[in-house]
């Protein structure tokens, strides 16, 4: 019988398996199986030969079954051997991996035409070769590379992500090096990594200017991630410290959203919008536009709202002049959180002010109006020499003065300040040429209060059916009557509305009513309280809609909440914040119904200013 005939019935590859790949025991067993299979095949051939009549059919089937069994056993053995071989290879790879020597890392400094590279590693600058699988032309300066035990570059990594923070002073003429200032004002020259070199071709500002995390061209003052040992700067780090203090937005507040301040709105539009919209006329008349505006007055009367509306209106008007789409109008409203500018480290507050104005100038140079709004201006720019626990104002105020009208001019930048203690702001800031325009935001009178109420009580609000019936279902007329009635109640000089009796230093006495301390914020609070009562009424009775009684009850509750707020410890300071100026106040007595007369107290020298209204 031929070799091919002997191999029939065995798995592929079995016939070629010899002692070279199997142990001696396995080879002997395979040889025995071969001989037995050959013998069985020979018996089978004899059984089906010319003398097959002497064999029974059952013997033939038994032989065939035995051959099949041997073939299956042979196949199973081959699978086991293959699996064992694969496991052996995997274990060998694991042993080789665990036995590899440690790899080092370095920073790529330069590449050369002969496929060698300069690498900084372990404090040394070395010229190394690269593995054949490394594309030297694709390597970038400043990139991290992995080295084997023979100091051959075997893998390219990313740029370093940790290191020291340094401030960029200037980029040198070659464009690949920069002067940076590190810890303790230490100056050093560093190389710029490839991403920073490529940033030279980017626009000077991102589309959203104050999104400092977006790629843009480097400029002095930027914070850079630096590896001082390798001498490389890898990345520009966004200045979160300034972003926390500056809120950049295009406000959505318009003049139509402000009630009761028509005269003040006209004043600020004349001061801010006219110079931007009619530059030619101002130039023809040699008229210099104002550099700043001060909004002062009692709390809650709309100073911040007006500042936001200025930015919104100015952006739209500029878009109209340029022929742009008003919906895409752009202006920048920098809302400076005044108290957060203060820092315990000497010079930090001044540095923040410099950065804010530097960035405002850069954006304004493109012709886009920039409004810098200082809220609570008295907190950081108070009169020099009046500090109790610190003298920080002696350096902060001069910094602002130099920014507003120093050697560097302010073009397309308007400074708006807001304060309810304008008497505490340094006079040098308030003089003409700095904050030129001073606009007093007064407390609303009855007419202004009706205008403010109309902003919150609109015709789309649900009104109770009984109130609508009185006006034959005319919703507009019903709302108007509600406003008139609630304003009459709020501004009536009746005993229920008496608030305080003040005694001046000259002995004169004056009764003050709640209307003397009204504000836009209080009116909004009254309306919100009435809406809450209407909601509770729906839940309790099922009757839906706002009623005039809800508004009247809200006025009573609002007045009751404010009866304990006047500061009787130092009434003169309290009166200044509340908007009452003039003769010095020495006594305050609350006149709210049900309040005892023991609340009267003389002014004394205590430094505690107490609760302000």
Swiss-Prot record:
What pathway or pathways are given for this protein in its record? Protein degradation; proteasomal Pup-dependent pathway
**Stretches for region Docks into pockets in the proteasome alpha-ring:** 612-613
One BP annotation, GO: modification-dependent protein catabolic process
Q: Which residues form a coiled coil?
A: 23-100
Key words, A-Z: ATP-binding, Chaperone, Coiled coil, Isopeptide bond, Nucleotide-binding, Proteasome, Ubl conjugation
Renumbered residue ranges of the record's region Disordered: 1-29
Q: Where does ATP bind?
A: 300-305
Which GO cellular component term is one of those annotated?
proteasome complex
**Cross-linked residues, Isoglutamyl lysine isopeptide (Lys-Gln) (interchain with Q-Cter in protein Pup):** 595
Described by its record, this protein's role is as follows: ATPase which is responsible for recognizing, binding, unfolding and translocation of pupylated proteins into the bacterial 20S proteasome core particle. May be essential for opening the gate of the 20S proteasome via an interaction with its C-terminus, thereby allowing substrate entry and access to the site of proteolysis. Thus, the C-termini of the proteasomal ATPase may function like a 'key in a lock' to induce gate opening and therefore regulate proteolysis.
Its quaternary organisation is: Homohexamer. Assembles into a hexameric ring structure that caps the 20S proteasome core. Strongly interacts with the prokaryotic ubiquitin-like protein Pup through a hydrophobic interface; the interacting region of ARC lies in its N-terminal coiled-coil domain. There is one Pup binding site per ARC hexamer ring. Upon ATP-binding, the C-terminus of ARC interacts with the alpha-rings of the proteasome core, possibly by binding to the intersubunit pockets.
Q: What is this protein called?
A: Proteasome-associated ATPase
């Amino acid at each position: 019988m031929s070799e091919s005939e002997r191999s029939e019935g065995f798995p592929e590859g079995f016939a070629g398996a010899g002692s070279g790949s199997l142990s001696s025991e396995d080879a002997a067993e395979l040889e025995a199986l071969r001989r037995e299979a050959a013998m069985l095949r020979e018996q089978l051939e004899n059984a089906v030969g010319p003398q097959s009549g002497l064999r029974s059919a059952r013997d033939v089937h038994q032989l065939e079954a035995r051959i099949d069994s041997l073939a299956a056993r042979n196949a199973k053995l081959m699978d086991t051997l293959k699996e064992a071989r694969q496991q052996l290879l995997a274990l060998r790879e694991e042993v080789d991996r665990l036995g590899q020597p440690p790899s080092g890392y370095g920073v790529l400094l330069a590449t050369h035409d002969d496929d060698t590279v300069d690498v900084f590693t372990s404090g040394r600058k070395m010229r190394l070769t690269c593995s054949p699988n490394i594309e030297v032309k694709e390597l970038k300066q400043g990139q991290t590379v992995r080295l084997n035990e023979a100091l051959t570059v075997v893998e390219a990594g990313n740029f370093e992500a940790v290191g020291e923070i340094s401030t960029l002073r200037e980029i040198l003429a070659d464009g690949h090096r920069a002067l940076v200032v590190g810890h303790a004002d230490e100056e050093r020259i560093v190389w710029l990594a490839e991403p920073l070199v490529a940033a030279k071709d980017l626009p000077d500002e991102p589309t959203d200017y104050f999104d400092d995390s977006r790629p843009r061209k480097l400029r002095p003052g930027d914070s850079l991630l630096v590896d001082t040992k390798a001498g490389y700067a890898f990345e520009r780090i966004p200045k979160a410290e300034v972003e926390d203090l500056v809120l950049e937005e295009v406000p959505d507040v318009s003049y139509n959203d402000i009630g009761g301040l028509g005269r003040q709105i006209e004043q600020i539009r004349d001061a801010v919008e006219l110079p931007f919209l009619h530059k030619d006329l101002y130039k023809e008349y040699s008229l210099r536009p104002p550099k700043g505006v001060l909004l002062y007055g009692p709390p809650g009367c709309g100073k911040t709202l007006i500042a936001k509306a200025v930015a919104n209106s100015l952006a739209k008007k500029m878009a109209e002049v340029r022929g742009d789409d008003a919906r895409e109008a752009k202006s920048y409203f920098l809302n400076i959180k005044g108290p957060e500018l203060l820092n315990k480290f000497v010079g930090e507050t001044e540095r923040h002010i410099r950065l804010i104005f530097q960035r405002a100038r850069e954006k304004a140079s493109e012709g886009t109006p920039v409004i810098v709004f200082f809220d609570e201006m008295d907190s950081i720019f108070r009169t020099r020499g009046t500090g109790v626990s610190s003298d920080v104002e002696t350096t902060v105020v001069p910094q602002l003065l130099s920014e507003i009208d120093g050697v560097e001019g302010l073009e397309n930048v308007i400074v708006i300040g807001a304060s309810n203690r304008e008497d505490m702001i340094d006079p040098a800031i308030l003089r003409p040429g700095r904050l030129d325009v001073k606009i007093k935001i007064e407390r609303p009178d009855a007419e202004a209060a009706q205008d403010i109420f109309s902003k919150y009580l609109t015709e789309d609000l649900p009104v109770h059916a009984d109130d609508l019936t009185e006006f034959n279902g005319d919703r507009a007329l019903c709302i108007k009557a509600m406003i008139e009635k609630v304003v009459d109640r709020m501004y009536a000089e009746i005993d229920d509305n008496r608030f305080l009796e003040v005694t001046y230093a000259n002995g004169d006495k004056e009764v003050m009513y709640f209307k003397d301390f009204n504000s836009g914020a209080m009116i909004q609070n009254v309306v919100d309280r009435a809406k809450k009562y209407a909601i509770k009424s729906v839940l309790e009775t099922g009757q839906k809609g706002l009623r005039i009684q809800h508004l009247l009850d809200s006025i009573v509750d609002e007045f009751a909440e404010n009866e304990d707020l006047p500061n009787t410890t130092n009434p003169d300071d309290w009166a200044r914040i509340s908007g009452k100026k003039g003769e010095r106040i020495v006594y305050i007595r609350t006149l709210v119904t049900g309040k005892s007369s023991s609340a009267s107290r003389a002014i004394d020298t205590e430094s505690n200013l107490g609760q302000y209204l």
